[in-house]
Amino acid sequence: MVAIGLGRVPSAIGQQTRELHVWHTEVEPQTVKTIQDTSIAEFEKKFPGFKVRQQALGWGDLNTKLLASLAAGNPPDLTHLNPFMTASLYTKQLLRPMDELIRALGESDIHEATLKLQYFDGKYYGVTHAMGATYFAERRDLREKKGIKPPETYDDMLKLCAALTEGGRYAFQMPGEKLYMGFVHPAEWLAGNGGSWVDPKTWRPQLNSKAMLEALDYAQKLNKFQPQGWPGQKYLDTLAALANGKIAMAHLSGARTIGYIERYAPEGMRDPEHFMPLLRPHGPSGKVGISALDGENWAVFTQSKYPNEAFEFLRLFYKKEHYLAYCHTVPIHLSPIFKSMLNDPTYLANERIKKWRPWHDVMVTGLKNNRFLPIGFSRPEDNLLPFLAELDGSGIVADMVVEVMVGGKNPKAEADRAQKRAEELLTQLGVKRWS
């Protein structure tokens, strides 16, 4: 079992306290406090010689800090990882397998949407902390007043945007951070338009493929329905703009948006009759729209100082009462990874889940109908690509999107330029398989 060798609890007298470093991406104060009061408190009681130091980091900061700590040889003992980074770290032999933990948690109860995301050569190297769907968040009342159905295609979405842009209000706003508009959204466009980042066999980039060109054309047309200064604004700014009526849809949203609606929307409008999720439309070459599934995985490194204790901490993190409390800190956005818990009356009894139940139902139905792929994935097999983290970090895709959307440049010319740069990058990384 994972607990092998954990009998060596240091004697309290005269022995220095050891620190278990845990990094994660849940920055909301109530979540940080709950982790401290549940898993950490129980862990420190169980292992009196240890102090757990948790550090909450935003997505963008996490990737940068992690890569620096790995290069320096002192990563945290336990961390969240973006799923598109995992294959890259696995091929560099930086991750420890966690099969025993997965079996202890209940392999068959972990949702299929996340179970095998970090599964390489017959072993598990990660476990998702929680699942959160992403989508448009819309002012449902405004769309319904126009008598328009939820859009299914790019054309439907452009017509809806034209109808909702009026009287100083814009139809939507995209977040300006490069990770979102330059990686997360292009992955969704490819996935929902029959495309992929690379050719599945040769790994040759597909940035100037028909699927990407159609998506860039759509993005360029969409741009006129959002406020001009959007590239300088962030994800959270778009949620505030939706809640206070400046826009009719936030392009990137999850159930975390509910907190903004309850804080900033006018009283009498803080409900699912006015605000609802809207799944992504599909392109002319696609059959169904795909949205990103937000769910970082826990990882333990080969360089971790206290790997046994890190796994022991995870057992406590997923202990039912601790995990329920964790998921309830951002209801619906932190949906449990366990199928049994998704329908558990104790989980569903949370006040916010009861009030916003239609948002929970969108998530569950989307999971059932395969409408979600992990962040940055254009197809399920992308979890095996060992260069997605580098492609994101290079800014190649982000530059292309900015030139097309903000600069109004020709999509084909920008896609050709990005394609050339991506081919050079993959060649430099030594992963070129095409001739």
Which role does the model predict for each range below?
Residues I35, S39, A211-Y218, E296, ...:
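Short amphipathic alpha-helical coupling segments at ligand-binding clamshell hinges
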Residues D77, G106-L142, A171, S285-S291, ...:
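A structural signal for short loop-to-beta-strand junctions that line the ligand-binding cleft
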Residues P83-Y135, K149, L158, G182-H185, ...:
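Hinge/lid segment of periplasmic solute-binding proteins
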Residues C161-L164, K201-G232, M276-R280:
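Glycine-centered hinge/linker elements that transmit conformational signals in sensory
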